[in-house]
Amino acid sequence: KLIVDSIDGIKIITTGSSVFDLSNKLGEPLVGRKNTIYLFPLAQMEFAKYQNFKETTQKLEERLLFGSYPELEQYLDWNDKINYLKEIINSYLLKDILVYEGIKQSNKILDLLKLIAFQVGQEVSLQELARQLGISKNTVESYLDLLSKVFVIYKVPGFSRNLRKEITKSNRWYFYDNGIRNGIIANFSRLEARTDVGALWENYVASERIKFQ
């Protein structure tokens, strides 16, 4: 803040998924001094800029399985893609979450992510999640909020033509990236060997849609 206020015309670029934690450590907010840009995994439209229709179609299965992180494009071997995603989950995503406010129940957060992964596109009951995990509903809400802030998952509120009922409807949760979702449940099997192909497509289409908001 001091740099921006004292040096005319200067621009400072900061990156990182843990930027949300800075808001609790800064003495003063940067209201009016910042512009936030969210960078999602690559969109299908971006791939189409350097791949023809045939190439893009042939790559669809890989996108459904491994997602769209840019770094994955350099790996030709599927095992390398899997190892890359495992590294992101273990050393990056979970690390960010656990460091935040000193959370120690890593197994509960991972189990919560697995439950969400198996219920992609379905209405999710917080009470049911709490019961299955053996924790309170408030803790589930807190964990979901953190997972949203580090861009692992996002919610789609329930819909009803009756606005009063809409408020009480359960949310649906989706992953920002299919690869992370599959990494959480440790399933990178090919499409013909899976029973969750519909969920993969729904999550992929939903994540593509949010990239254009």
What are the functions of these language-model segments?
Residues S17-V19, S23-S125:
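Interdomain motor-coupling "hinge/lid" segment immediately C-terminal to the ATP-binding subdomain
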Residues W78-Q213:
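Accessory nucleic acid-recognition modules appended to NTPase machines
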Residues G9, R33, T57-L60, V150, ...:
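A structure-centric signal for secondary-structure junctions around beta-strands
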Residues K1:
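Conserved AAA+/SF3 P-loop NTPase catalytic/coupling segment centered on the Walker-B
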Residues I7, Y38, F212:
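Acidic-histidine catalytic/liganding microenvironments
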Residues V4-L26, L147:
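Sensor-1/coupling segment of RecA-like P-loop NTPase cores
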Residues T15, L39, V156-G158:
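Conserved beta-strand termini and adjacent loop/short-helix elements that scaffold enzyme active sites
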